[in-house]
Each structure stands twice: as structure tokens, then as C-alpha cells.
């Protein structure tokens, strides 16, 4: 039986088993390099499965696939959260990527010319580490939330699943990003709904048509691949702003 306190040595540790971590794993395996992916979830794709019931990707499935394996189904369809989760699980299985689930990394440190990764009683030593963890995993709740009347139901998007969790009456959605807008549209079908957040701008044409989606996706892809990259000053500036 393995000693959980024994230091395990491996060439490369990848922290995070989502899209980024699995993609890195695919490239490492393709080159025959030894590695191990550590993921805090009990099952690959659980970060998606835990989101609200109606969640869909807002990019077509043709752009949701990872290297070496297309996303199944129609290329212009918008996958559900569970379809995305199952795809990631199938991806790891197909390429036999070494993923160790249920391992939450607590600390990453440098000792000499190596890195030490600590996860509870487990310790791993690696020549290099790829940090592929997702941002925004911890809910952020405004400080004034505790001062609101206790009769007001408060839910963070992290805990929201469907409108059945809400009591009758109006709903205020705080935050006008993708999650806030998506939830507000769903809630508004059965409740008076308001949104509070920064001005997000407006696309100057209707995006629900096939032609609009065709050009919009390609425009976003062009900016993502050629403009907003670390090779361009504007990309580096935006990256610094997001990280800080």
C-alpha cells in the first residue's frame, strides 16, 4: 500500500484537469514526456456539472473541442454543461491521460532546482509545473449582503441551479457578465427581474441569425488569435489587468 506521506517524483505536474490541463496533457503525451495531472474534482468535468441546470456554452461546439478530438454533434450547436463535462471525461479516457482526481493542491514551492507540490498529506516533486487551474472558483459576495433583510433569498451563481430555488416576487441579479445575463434571462420568464452591473456595451446587430453568428464567431476568433495575445501590447495590457 502506498505511503501517502512519501514524496512522489515526476518530470511534469499539471495542476488542473479542465480544458487547459487536459490540452497540456495531450501535448505532453504526444511527445512521450512523463507527467501527472492533479485535479481537485472527484470526476473529470465536475466543474461543469455543478453549474446551473440550463447552462450552455455561448460558443458553437466546433470551437469547443480540444486538440486531437472534435466535439461531437452539430458544429453550429451550443453544448450543454453536461455535454461539455462528458466530452472532457471522454477526452481524458481516449488519450489515456494520467489524471489523479480528488487531489486539491494546497501549496506550490520551489526547493533548489525542483518544485514541490503539496496536497494534504501528498507531496509531489517535479522538474516543471504547469498551473492550469480555472479563475473565479471562489464565490465573491459583496460585504453589504449580510446587512440585507433575512427574508430576502440570496443566491450566488455558484449555488444557483434553477428558478425553483427562488421565492415569489421580484429578482435582482447583481452582475451583468455572461453568468448574470444568462441567469437573468431564465429568471425573467417567471419573475419581475432587474440587473445591476457595469455597462457591457451592445452588439450593433441581431446575433440570433445564422449569418450573424457565422461572422461574429470568426471575428472573436480573429481577435483572440491575432490581436489579444501576449505577443501584442494590447494583449499583454489586458492580461495584466485581468490578473491584477
Where are these regions (language model features)?
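Glycine-rich dinucleotide-binding loop and its adjacent helix/turn
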Residues: 74, 80-83, 133-193
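Feature captures the FAD/FMN-dependent oxidoreductase FAD-binding
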Residues: 77-137
Amino acid at each position: 500500500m502506498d505511503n501517502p506521506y512519501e514524496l512522489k517524483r515526476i518530470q511534469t505536474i499539471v495542476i488542473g484537469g479542465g480544458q487547459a490541463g487536459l490540452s497540456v496533457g495531450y501535448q505532453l503525451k504526444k511527445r512521450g514526456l512523463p507527467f501527472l495531472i492533479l485535479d481537485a474534482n472527484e470526476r473529470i468535468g465536475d466543474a461543469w456539472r455543478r453549474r446551473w441546470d440550463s447552462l450552455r456554452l455561448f460558443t458553437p461546439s466546433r470551437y469547443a473541442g480540444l486538440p486531437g478530438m472534435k466535439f461531437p454533434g452539430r458544429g453550429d450547436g451550443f453544448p450543454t454543461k453536461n455535454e461539455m463535462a462528458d466530452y472532457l471525461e471522454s477526452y481524458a479516457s481516449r488519450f489515456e491521460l494520467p489524471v489523479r482526481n480528488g487531489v486539491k493542491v494546497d501549496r506550490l514551492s520551489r526547493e533548489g532546482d525542483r518544485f514541490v507540490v503539496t496536497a494534504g498529506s501528498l507531496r509531489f516533486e517535479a522538474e516543471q509545473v504547469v498551473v492550469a487551474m480555472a479563475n473565479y472558483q471562489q464565490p465573491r459576495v459583496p460585504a453589504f449582503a449580510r446587512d440585507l433583510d433575512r427574508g430576502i433569498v440570496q443566491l450566488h451563481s455558484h449555488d444557483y441551479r434553477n428558478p425553483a430555488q427562488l421565492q415569489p416576487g421580484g429578482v435582482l441579479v447583481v452582475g451583468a457578465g455572461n453568468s448574470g445575463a444568462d441567469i437573468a434571462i431564465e429568471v425573467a420568464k417567471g419573475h419581475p427581474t432587474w440587473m445591476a452591473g457595469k455597462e457591457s456595451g451592445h452588439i450593433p446587430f441581431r446575433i440570433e441569425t445564422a449569418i450573424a453568428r457565422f461572422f461574429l464567431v470568426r471575428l472573436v476568433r480573429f481577435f483572440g488569435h491575432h490581436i489579444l495575445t501576449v505577443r501584442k501590447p494590447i494583449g499583454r495590457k489586458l492580461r495584466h489587468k485581468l490578473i491584477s
